[in-house]
Regions:
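Cofactor-binding beta-sheet edge motifs in enzyme active sites
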Residues: 1-12, 19, 24-352
Length: 352
């Protein structure tokens, strides 16, 4: 494809997940499970993914008459917490109080071009566009502030316009109020489009241990450890939430989820009454660790994280179940690894 990985320390990721997941102690835990008549397996899943889609986005910042600020973006959150990230990012780079910032998403009247949300791209690409808009905004306001205050060598530092040797200390909100009073509507709305020079590649490792009851085929995930390299993290708590949700989705796909039809083609899993998804007691405690190697393909060093939990979970959980079955001479079997399929595989192995 002509693409190349931006950055990564894959050996460090592998070493860290083995240490945090206590891979060295697995043999003892497997023996303990066997003493109770259980089958225990360990699975490792290594992944590298790419932020996909158009690596460009637009961002528009508008200073409203009521003293608030609207950041219009081309992406659209559907539960990831983009509003929190975008607000926090704009506040950190402008000094504008977060409570004054409103996020407007996916409005094509304001942002004609937007790549939307998908492929772990939103925060990485959108914050790059926002940073570009902030830079353009500061560049436009600086000569205006200098002219209005009669001050030379105006600089924007830590959210405030300052000038050496003067007591100038003007926030962007105050500068916007001055611009409004002066009839400078051109300074009240700023929009730029920014394009990343290349894609970033999130990567990581999942280490999983499962225990199977051979009498029932029931599988429990006993240990789950994740080490990810997402580059620079803007909102670590949201990253952890996305990883947890992605892991659960991966567990569901491997262990339970399937579309079932009858002989006439009628779907039998048409609602959540029949379509199996993980419940709270199916989900283990997920230990998450970050080993960031900042990307060199965007100013903030971010790599994206949206789909990483699922991508890593699929192989790791499947490998753990197959490892456990192999101790009894069973498998491999196809997903989903339902209790019935696992029980049949073990029965067939015993029958020889």
């Amino acid at each position: 494809t002509g693409e190349s990985y931006d950055t990564g320390d894959f050996v460090r990721i592998l070493d860290r997940v083995g240490a945090e997941g206590d891979a060295a102690g697995f043999a003892a835990r497997r023996a303990s499970s066997a003493a109770r008549g259980m089958l225990r397996g360990m699975g490792l899943g290594l992944y590298v993914e790419s932020i996909l889609g158009d690596p460009s986005e637009a961002a528009e910042v508008t200073f409203e008459a009521d003293g608030t600020v609207t950041l219009a973006v081309g992406t659209q959150s559907n539960g990831q917490g983009h509003e929190t990230v975008y607000t926090r990012f704009l506040a950190a780079n402008t000094g504008i109080a977060p409570e004054r910032i409103r996020i407007l998403q996916g409005d094509s009247d304001r942002i004609p071009k937007g790549g939307g949300t998908g492929g772990s791209r939103s925060v990485t690409v959108q914050t790059n566009a926002t940073l570009s808009t902030v830079s353009a905004m500061v560049a436009a306001f600086t000569p205006f502030v200098a002219a209005e205050t009669g001050t030379a060598d105006v600089r924007f530092e830590e959210g405030v316009f300052r000038a050496p040797g003067s007591n100038l200390g003007l926030s962007l909100i105050e500068a916007a109020e001055m611009a409004r009073a002066a009839g400078r509507a051109d300074l009240l709305r700023h929009r730029t489009e920014a394009r990343l020079p290349g894609r970033s590649y999130p990567n990581g490792a999942h280490l999983v241990e499962v225990e199977i009851d051979p009498e029932t085929g029931r599988t429990r995930i006993e240990r789950y450890t994740v080490v990810d390299d997402f580059g620079t993290l803007v909102a670590p708590e949201l990253v952890m939430g996305q990883v947890h949700g992605g892991v659960v989705q991966g567990i569901g796909q491997v262990m339970a989820e399937a579309i079932v039809h009858d002989a006439e083609g009628q779907i039998l899993t048409g609602s959540l009454m029949d379509y199996a998804i993980p419940r709270a007691d199916d989900v283990p405690f997920i230990r998450f660790f970050s080993e960031p190697v900042p990307s060199v393909r965007n100013p903030l060093g971010m790599k994206g994280c949206g789909e990483a939990g699922t991508v890593g979970a699929l192989g790791a959980v499947a490998n753990a179940v197959r490892d456990a079955l192999a101790t009894a001479g069973a498998g491999p079997i196809e997903t989903p690894f339902t209790p019935e399929r696992i029980w049949r595989a073990l029965r067939d192995a015993r029958a020889g």
